[in-house]
């Protein structure tokens, strides 16, 4: 224990001469053999799905690099709560968010997939539910900068440790070369199947009998009125899930939300920080009453 007077008293801090983090090393370039193995598995897949996570944002993977990989593979993709802005919401291969608050198409595609390519996500319980029932027919390719995340929840058939900014373009090159040499499986029937599910079960809401506005409708109108460079921020709760489904993202780094920790009260100070960092861009906070009351004194 540290005594209260020691906790509250002034002290002097001196930076150590070297910042040493024992037990952790930044990964080098991705393993070429693993990349080749991943390209082989993807090219043989008849029902592949790309599972895109927030690590793509944190690694600052260029949009053009990610778009090239997605369109080269041509598979439908899902985006986790922290990755909603890594690819345009209106991209024809985008199935939306997976998991317990996800779209029917995203959940259904993962459950039917024969290969899941996970880029910067962690197979958390809000996506998988019970891990032993998640995508049971799929081989898993898992890419992460942290080796401790790989095979932690779901065993990876092809583990790749590396910075996604390096892995994404390298995998594009490897996949293109493999297909040129050996061809690939036909995924047109799979894309058609997923497209039919998406068309049959769109995201929507039911109008109220008394004609009052639904929250989803309010968010939709706000989205239509906002400019493309708007930064969207939310608190945690139902309004967060409505925002995830009804906002349209067209560029990266336009979405701030508390996901894994799920911290109520996050929204207002985060929105103020976003505006301080980007004073020339509009910033909208969509918040709940409970979240707002937790930190409204920040104003």
Show which residues each predicted segment covers.
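Conformationally flexible catalytic loops at phosphate/diphosphate-handling active centers
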Residues: 1-44, 202-205
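Conserved thiamine diphosphate
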Residues: 1-8, 81-84, 110, 120-142, ...
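Glycine-rich beta-alpha junction loops
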Residues: 1-7, 54-56, 147, 236-240
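Glycine-rich, acidic loop regions that bind phosphate or pyrophosphate groups
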Residues: 26, 83-191
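Glycine-rich phosphate/diphosphate-binding loops that line cofactor/substrate pockets in enzymes
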Residues: 34-50, 69, 110-113, 221-230, ...
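Thiamine diphosphate
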Residues: 107, 112, 150-161, 165-169, ...
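Active-site diphosphate/adenylate-binding microenvironment
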Residues: 192-280
């Amino acid at each position: 224990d540290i005594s209260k007077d020691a906790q509250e008293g002034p002290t002097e801090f001196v930076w150590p001469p070297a910042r040493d983090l024992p037990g952790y090393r930044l990964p080098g370039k991705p393993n070429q053999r693993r990349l080749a193995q991943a390209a082989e598995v993807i090219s043989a897949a008849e029902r592949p799905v790309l599972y895109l996570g927030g690590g793509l944002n944190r690694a600052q993977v260029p949009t053009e690099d990610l778009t090239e990989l997605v369109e080269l593979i041509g598979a439908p993709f899902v985006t986790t709560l922290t990755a909603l802005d890594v690819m345009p919401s209106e991209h024809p291969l985008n199935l939306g968010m997976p998991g317990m608050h996800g779209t029917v198409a995203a959940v259904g595609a993962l459950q039917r997939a024969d290969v899941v390519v996970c880029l910067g996500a962690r197979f958390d319980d809000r996506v998988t539910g019970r891990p032993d029932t998640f995508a049971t027919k799929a081989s898993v390719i898992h890419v992460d900068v942290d080796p401790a995340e790989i095979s932690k929840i779901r065993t990876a058939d092809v583990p790749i440790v590396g910075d996604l900014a390096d892995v994404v373009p390298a995998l594009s090159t490897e996949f293109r070369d493999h297909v040129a040499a050996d061809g690939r499986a036909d995924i047109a029937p799979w894309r058609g199947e997923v497209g039919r599910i998406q068309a049959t079960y769109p995201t929507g809401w039911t109008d109220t009998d008394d004609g009052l506005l639904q929250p989803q409708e309010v968010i939709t109108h706000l989205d239509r009125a906002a400019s493309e460079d708007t930064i969207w921020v939310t608190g945690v709760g139902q309004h967060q899930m409505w925002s995830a489904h009804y906002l349209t993202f067209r560029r990266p780094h336009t979405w701030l939300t508390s996901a894994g920790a799920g911290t109520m009260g996050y929204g207002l100070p985060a929105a103020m920080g976003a505006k301080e960092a980007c004073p020339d861009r509009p910033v909208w906070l969509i918040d709940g009453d409970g979240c707002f009351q937790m930190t409204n004194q920040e104003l």
